[in-house]
Amino acid sequence: MPPKTRASAARKPRRKANKNITVGQAHIKSTFNNTIVSITDTTGAVISWASSGEVGFKGSRKSTPYAAQMAAEQAAKRAQEHGMKKVDVFVKGPGSGRETAIRSLQAAGLEVGSIQDVTPMAHNGARPAKRRRV
């Protein structure tokens, strides 16, 4: 097998071609440690995404509402480059950045159609983790 050349080893990632998708879904997953915002088309194919960590926050600052706001703004801007105008929001998780991320999507210029909470609730399945003692 011939050795890899420098050009093929350091390949630049290609940017997605601009799609004209006007209606989509915004999935906000807000945990106690991070907030991830994914904007998809109506079938669920991801168009843009951002997280508190990807925006530049590290450690405990990722879990703040401000970090969620910045992540939602960045995801919304990238989605608007593909023609996104209206989104239905699906919120999952107990984190502190839920409401802030929704408000940030509206402030960025996306029209929010509906908001649904899709947090998974156990019907007495696995035993939960032990209570923290501080």
Swiss-Prot record:
PROSITE patterns in the cross-refs: RIBOSOMAL_S11
Alphabetical UniProt keywords: Ribonucleoprotein, Ribosomal protein, RNA-binding, rRNA-binding
Presence of the UniProt keyword Ribonucleoprotein in the record: yes
Protein family membership: Belongs to the universal ribosomal protein uS11 family.
Record text on subunit structure and interactions: Part of the 30S ribosomal subunit. Interacts with proteins S7 and S18. Binds to IF-3.
Role, per record: Located on the platform of the 30S subunit, it bridges several disparate RNA helices of the 16S rRNA. Forms part of the Shine-Dalgarno cleft in the 70S ribosome.
Record-given protein name: Small ribosomal subunit protein uS11
Gene that encodes the chain: rpsK
